[in-house]
């Protein structure tokens, strides 16, 4: 059947002439430079930072010559998550995680910026002179080379100003990225197919009287093209109520409702037209005079005259530049019913900005045509309104979705808005960029906030990326994960130590494999003995410190020279009792300066025959060097004032010796509530030494706590742990809302970070099961992520007693196959009717 509608080819009407040196040249000799724009992540920008971004745009726009066009084009495309399950080395839990998010829909954001130099004549053209309506085009010669050179210099300045702002990155597109190659589509091709994928299909474009179609997609256009449609007041940013509280403020850009918060396929076009400012003002002066002379005939003329005069007064008094502006939201769908919903959604989002929603059907083709990269000068002048640069820039969207880290190492978290999995590196990349100076982490989350879930999720992924993980726990939080690793590796890994009187954890502090005692090792021995000798609240005198230091040094000298002396606590005790006592007498050290009998008496329980003689005289070292996942469970002794701190130090010593021997391998020690055992004044130097050593040997020390009171009341925590942890991780703090000022001061959080922390779990998606977590790096980079996991991971990490019992009972029935038990249990919960 013959097509009765008038048809033509795209080639016939195509408005672009060529692309040279990364510049798009139109058939009317307009020159356009294209950029890819990287915006800050959602919910990570404060009001002051939005002001700074606005100021940078303002400075940049002002360097462009007259008759330039700034066109920012934001693409928001619905996509589905494609899981990466083809890798052979994926673990059972990683594969479960990927499957859980299979086909998860999310909104992908891509942002472009086009800077166009046109002419006075072109900037005044209306829609009836669009290249769409003209029969043929004749390429013009660009006669004035100086104009082009000056424009390109201004573009270079524009790029520098924006990139120097520290918030936005502009990357200039090359010719291949504009026109495409045989393998990948360019931005022009992508525009005509309403897609951002590298492989696109060009579709027929249908321009009807009341609708426009591209392939099967019907376009729905809303425009902001009249000052009357605008709100009475615009700003750089606005308060996002869903994530704000009476004590915190979550900010988004003024135009965010039509950006990432509008969850449908759409393009948000923002145009600023820079005309001749002086000529604009002359026109307005003339218009004001005309209105004045006609004011007797109509009150409207009198009102219009006063509006024009107010605009002129503002221009002269504030030194503002007159420009034209236009914004439009181009949404589409191949389903007419869905399109009705989209139309309502766009209208609602515009109303949130206090703009008057205007559904435009007449100008859709010409506005679509003007949005072609490089064809900005074809914009119909009647669709723009006069304003100032500052106000026009408030209509720019200034944020994007969360991004994955470009790093091979990292952990999988989830975007709190879209639910898309993200790969984030909170250790290596921030270190490389200088955002942090150490990899240590401090985690704070009250009971029930999802803390152990997050730590399980994190250490599991560290382990799978070949890190050595050592955990000190007091609540069986890691039993499921450890047991699973143990069974998977047939006992080679996943070692679970529980402190019992029959099988206590013991070691030898004086044992060094290579026989070399460096300063750090000597310091750790001194700290250990000091902990045994003095109570937490009993600080040693300077004389006592010197005497202890000399005792340790001279004993070490003895054992390195005399191989007949077995290095252990027993021989150290005997040495102090005999040789060192004589040494003190020779030096006339007074008893009040160092009471050696008191020292020996206090340490006697650790000497042979004493109550704790097994603790420091082990004849065998804990052989944990090649075990990659170890858990020490100290729940049985967490209230024991002697055993708890000593055992914790022993474990830390084991970790340090592991660190020294394993070169170039990531090591991680995570201390749960056991940190309280070492948070005494006498331990301060030891903790500082531990943190210093950890950094030196490619390690990470992670301290986890749930009690705010503990950290507020302990100066040692602040000085030794928090100050040496550049990564802070906080979970839901609403429980401590009234105490949050002291937490903020203690952790050194900025107001921006405070707002982010207090937004945790305020607007969780009802259809997804997850808890949110805030991760702050070095006080400069921070965001809130979701810890969402598959059911398989859930049953591995769960700390619920009933769920654990159900899992282990099923595992026993299946002959101890924990992985199969997890699979079966997860499947039964997913499909309960089977």
Predicted regions and their residues:
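The start of beta-strands in P-loop NTPase/AAA+ ATPase cores
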Residues: 31, 109-111, 468, 628, ...
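P-loop NTPase motor core of the ASCE superfamily
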Residues: 100, 514-567, 715-834
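Extended, folded cores of ATP/NTP-driven motor/assembly subunits in large transport
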Residues: 1-399
């Amino acid at each position: 059947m013959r097509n009765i509608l008038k048809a033509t080819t795209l080639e016939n009407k195509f408005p672009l002439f060529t692309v040279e040196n990364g510049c798009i040249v139109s058939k009317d000799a307009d020159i356009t430079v294209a950029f890819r724009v990287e915006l800050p992540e959602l919910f990570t920008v404060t009001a002051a930072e939005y002001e700074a971004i606005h100021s940078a745009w303002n400075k940049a726009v002002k360097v462009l010559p007259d008759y330039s066009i700034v066109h920012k084009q934001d693409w928001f495309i619905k996509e589905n998550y494609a899981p990466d399950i083809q890798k052979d080395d994926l673990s059972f839990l990683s594969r479960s995680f990927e499957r859980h998010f299979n086909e998860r829909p999310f909104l992908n954001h891509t942002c472009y910026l086009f800077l166009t130099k046109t002419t006075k004549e072109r900037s005044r053209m209306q829609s009836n002179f669009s290249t769409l309506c003209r029969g043929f085009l004749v390429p013009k010669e660009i006669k004035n080379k100086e104009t082009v050179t000056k424009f390109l210099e201004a573009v270079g300045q524009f790029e520098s100003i924006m990139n120097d702002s520290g918030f936005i990155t502009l990357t200039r597109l090359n010719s291949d990225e504009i026109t495409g190659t045989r393998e990948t589509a360019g931005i022009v091709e992508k525009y005509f197919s309403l897609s951002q994928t590298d492989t696109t299909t060009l579709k027929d474009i249908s321009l009807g009287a009341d609708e426009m179609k591209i392939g099967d997609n019907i376009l729905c256009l809303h425009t902001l093209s009249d000052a009357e449609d605008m709100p009475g007041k615009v700003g750089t940013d606005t308060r996002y109520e869903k994530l704000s509280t009476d004590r915190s403020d979550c900010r988004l850009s003024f135009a965010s409702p039509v950006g990432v918060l509008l969850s449908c396929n759409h393009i948000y076009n923002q145009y600023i037209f820079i005309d001749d400012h002086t000529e604009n003002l002359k026109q307005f002066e003339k218009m004001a005079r005309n209105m004045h002379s006609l004011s007797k005939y109509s009150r409207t003329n009198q009102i219009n005259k006063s509006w024009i005069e107010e605009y002129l007064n503002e221009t002269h008094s504030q030194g503002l530049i007159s420009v034209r502006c236009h914004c439009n939201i181009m949404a589409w769908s191949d389903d007419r019913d869905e399109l009705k919903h989209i139309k309502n959604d766009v209208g609602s989002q515009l109303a949130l900005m206090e703009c008057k929603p205007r559904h435009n059907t007449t100008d859709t083709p010409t506005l679509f045509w003007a949005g072609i990269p490089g064809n900005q000068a074809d914009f119909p002048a009647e669709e723009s309104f006069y304003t100032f640069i500052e106000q026009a820039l408030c209509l720019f969207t200034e944020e994007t979705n969360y991004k994955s880290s470009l790093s091979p190492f990292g952990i999988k978290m989830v975007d709190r808005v879209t639910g898309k999995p993200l790969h984030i590196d909170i250790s290596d990349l921030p270190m490389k960029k200088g955002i942090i100076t150490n990899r240590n982490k401090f985690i704070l989350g009250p009971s029930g906030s999802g803390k152990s879930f997050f730590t399980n999720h994190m250490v599991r992924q560290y382990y799978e990326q070949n890190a050595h993980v050592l955990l000190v726990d007091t609540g069986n939080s890691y039993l499921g994960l450890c047991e699973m690793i143990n069974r998977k590796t047939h006992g080679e890994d996943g070692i679970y130590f529980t402190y019992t009187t029959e099988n206590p954890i013991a070691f030898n502090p004086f044992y060094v494999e290579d026989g070399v005692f460096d300063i750090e090792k000597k310091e750790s021995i001194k700290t250990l003995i000091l902990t045994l000798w003095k109570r937490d609240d009993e600080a040693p005198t300077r004389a006592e410190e010197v005497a202890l230091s000399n005792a340790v040094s001279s004993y070490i000298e003895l054992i390195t020279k005399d191989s007949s002396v077995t290095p252990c606590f027993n021989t150290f005790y005997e040495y102090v009792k005999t040789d060192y006592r004589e040494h003190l007498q020779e030096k006339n050290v007074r008893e009040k300066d160092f009471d050696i009998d008191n020292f020996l008496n206090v340490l006697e329980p650790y000497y042979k025959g004493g109550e704790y003689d097994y603790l420091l005289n082990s004849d065998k070292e804990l052989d944990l060097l090649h075990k990659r996942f170890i858990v020490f469970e100290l729940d049985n002794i967490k209230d024991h004032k002697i055993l708890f701190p000593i055992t914790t130090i022993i474990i830390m010593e084991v970790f340090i010796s592991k660190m020294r021997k394993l070169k170039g391998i990531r090591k991680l020690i995570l201390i749960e509530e056991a940190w309280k055992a070492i948070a005494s004044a006498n331990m301060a130097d030891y903790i500082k030494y531990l943190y210093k050593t950890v950094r030196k040997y490619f390690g990470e020390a992670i301290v986890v706590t749930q009690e705010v009171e503990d950290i507020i009341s302990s100066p040692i925590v602040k000085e030794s742990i928090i100050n040496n942890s550049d990564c802070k991780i906080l979970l839901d703090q609403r429980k401590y809302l009234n105490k949050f000022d002291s937490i903020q001061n203690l952790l050194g959080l900025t107001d921006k970070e405070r707002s982010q922390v207090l937004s945790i779990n305020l607007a969780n998606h009802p259809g997804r099961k997850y808890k949110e977590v805030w991760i702050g790096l070095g006080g400069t980079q921070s965001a809130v992520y979701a810890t969402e996991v598959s059911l398989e991971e859930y049953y591995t990490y769960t700390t619920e007693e009933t769920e654990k019992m159900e899992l282990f009972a099923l595992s026993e029935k299946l002959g101890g196959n924990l992985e199969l038990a997890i699979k079966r249990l997860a499947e039964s919960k997913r499909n309960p009717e089977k």
